[in-house]
């Protein structure tokens, strides 16, 4: 059981932001954060994840970002992709979110990330109260649903401060062990 440290490099340090604040000048011991990681199964293959797993417009943004990355070395603006996708390209879907065996149906789901930490996607905070080292080691899913394009855009911008959860008619945060 060696000590494992994380040192921030690059621009997307959502993991570091979650465990040590906005920045860290020194390496951070991460052993506690990488044991018993949650898993996701996609097309029969199981993967562990550190921060979050997306559903909805964030998946669309990753697809567009991957295509742009193949075209050149310019920095990918995921927020810009999300806003353009929301206004012109992405269509919300109806979804059933299952949390610890309880099915919760939602109409017009724009976003539904399952989170181990609080941050992902370049500083978005979909589940501001999520605690990756909480006593029960639960996960959170934030469901953004039922809103028009304009209202979605207005609410979406508040996700970077975690204030979107105040829009209770369109945002639900559910917690559980199996999502």
Features from the language model and the residues they span:
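Catalytic core of DAGKc-family lipid kinases
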Residues: 2-110
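Flexible, active-site-adjacent loop/turn segments at secondary-structure boundaries
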Residues: 13, 53-55, 59, 118, ...
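Short, glycine/acidic-enriched capping/hinge loops at junctions between secondary-structure elements
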Residues: 16-17, 63-64, 123-126, 153-154
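Residue-level signature of transmembrane alpha-helix interfaces in integral membrane proteins
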Residues: 24-26, 129-132, 156
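Gly/Ser/Thr-rich active-site loops/lids in small-molecule metabolic enzymes
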Residues: 69-78, 117, 121-151
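Exposed beta-strand and adjacent loop surfaces of beta-rich binding modules
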Residues: 92-96, 138, 178
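ATP/nucleoside-binding phosphotransfer catalytic cores, i.e., glycine-rich phosphate-binding loops
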Residues: 101, 133-136, 143-179
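Short hydrophobic core segments
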Residues: 110-116
